[in-house]
Amino acid sequence: MIEIPNLEQLGLTQNEWFDVCQLAKNREIESPVLLDVQRTASSLNRWDVVYSLSLLAGLETSVLIDSEDNISIDWGDPGRVILKAPHGFMAPFKLWVHTHPGFTAYWSSTDTNSLALGSTIIENALVLGAPGIKKSRNSEFCVLEENNNKISQFGPLNQWTDEEIIGWKQWYQSLQDNTVMEKIV
């Protein structure tokens, strides 16, 4: 089991989290319980949970969130997650998240092909890896600062920022800060 803070935010007890971890370790990735936890975690931006389950299963996970906050979850072997057509989903997609379990967070050639193909329908993308979270924002959907690094200087990847990895420790600190602010407001 991987220790996850603030399980109550997910509506889970330690025992329930242990059971979900067992499902992931056993690669029971179509389990409604596991998928429900992933959807809840995704809706709360709890990428630590999504990454941990992916790491335990030894499989990559892809999360797609549409313009109406519908969430689609797909699983696959490293380097190959076949996305199921999310019926009834509305573009543009707010976010595409995928994992590199046990490896660094980087934009692989498969990832950059997906970003290039999705450059007119995906607003933001994250890759979750062992050191943390790597984010990219699509300039077609937001105003960026002047000196942002891009994934490429040419073609559709020129629309996508190439941002530094945010380490898990730093990410947890921002999660804790946001939780404190929510309690104040």
Model-derived regions: residue spans:
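Conserved beta-strand-loop surface patch within small alpha/beta domains used
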Residues: 1-95, 102-185
